[in-house]
Amino acid sequence: ISMKGGVPSHDTFRRIFCILDFENFQKIFIAWTQDIKKSLKIKNDQICIDGKTLCGSLNKLKSMKAVHMVNAWSTGMSMSLGQIPTEEKSNEITAIPLLLDLLDLKNCLVSIDAIGCQTEIANKVTVKGGNYLLAVKENQKGLYEEELRQTEIMRLN
């Protein structure tokens, strides 16, 4: 592509991103990723949901907390399908269902770490036609003990 005025600067991109409506951009971006998925004929994708604190986003001088995002990553397309900002890591539980609402999960395996091991999240994935792989930790005592029991039964058989 020929750019008569030269390549846009970092500042130009920053100004554009600052005026974009985040929610509308996100909807358009997710629709675009779904079109790519269809054109690549990816039918059984794995979607990895994970929260990350953005490096360098903490600003102590301005009393600004670090930015935390919950991201959905497609292993089949090797790209992010969408993300939701959260106030803190503890808010991932409320952000994950919002992110799942935006995604097409039909025939997908959705993997989430232990913070996503919630009945509401598992139900949402299955209602949307997907399957889930959730990590279980000891802080969910009943579920953890049942998992150990089932694992022992499978090992003995």
For each predicted feature, which ranges?
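Flexible, active-site-adjacent loop/turn segments at secondary-structure boundaries
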Residues: 5, 52, 79, 134, ...
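Surface-exposed loop/turn and secondary-structure junction residues enriched for glycine/proline
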Residues: 6, 10, 23, 57, ...
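Active-site- or DNA-interface-adjacent structural scaffold in DNA-acting proteins
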Residues: 3-62, 129
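Generic hydrophobic, helix-prone segments enriched in Leu/Val/Ile
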Residues: 4, 70, 147-151
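An internal, acidic/charged active-site-proximal segment
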Residues: 86-157
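Active-site-proximal flexible loops/turns
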Residues: 16, 57, 81, 120-121
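Preference for short coil/turn "hinge" residues that link or interrupt alpha-helices
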Residues: 13, 74-77, 129, 136
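RNase H-like nuclease fold core
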Residues: 35-106
